[in-house]
Amino acid sequence: EDSVDLKKVTLPDGVTKIGPSAFYGCSKLTTVNIPAKLEEIDDYTFSGCTQLTDIKLSESVTYVGESAFEGCSNLNSVTLSENTETIGDCAFYECDSLYSINLENVSQIGAGAFVYCANLDDIDLTNCSLIGENAFSVCQSLINIKFPDSIYSIPQTAFEYTLWEQSAPDGVLYAGDFAYKIIGDFTDSTLTFKDNTYAINDDFLSYNEYVKKINLPDSLTSIGASAFE
């Protein structure tokens, strides 16, 4: 409570971890200098720091914890380390000014990590192997997504209410060559997947009463759980 008026934080070079809720609710904090040896940012560390505008993580940071930057409403730019592997649940929840973050080296993104990041329009998930429920839900500007070449399960809520999903035509929505989900009411009697489709998502066409025939491509290597239940 005594730290709510903090405006700038410079951490010693030897610091390797910032503890949970360390700067929670420091609503006047504008500048944080991340030490070179820092390895992780714990849960809720900067949650509610509404005046933070940008953050650059040191090369040693591998983990961003649950709700670490939740509610940082003026945070517009985040530079992750090339070694950052994991983004925790709700890590950037309601960072509604965020428009730039480099995710190309991240392998795991937790549930709700970027919900309500309304200005985020472009992301690179090239090396991501795990995407949580609602990870990018209600990212209303999100239109450009670079997907990995091999991912075998993505929750069907992961990109709900994004421009990418809402602007897609009815039918099969692909994440690269991964058959992600059906958009709209699929009432055709035949379902045909495009060439080069390598996998079909879990729960892809559950409880559909219309499809009588499914054409699977030779490229297919995986069919998810309950895909056609």
Where are these regions (language model features)?
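Structural signature of tandem-repeat unit edges
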Residues: 3-17, 27-40, 50-63, 73-86, ...
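Consensus positions within tandem repeat domains that build extended binding/scaffold surfaces
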Residues: 1, 19-24, 42-47, 65-70, ...
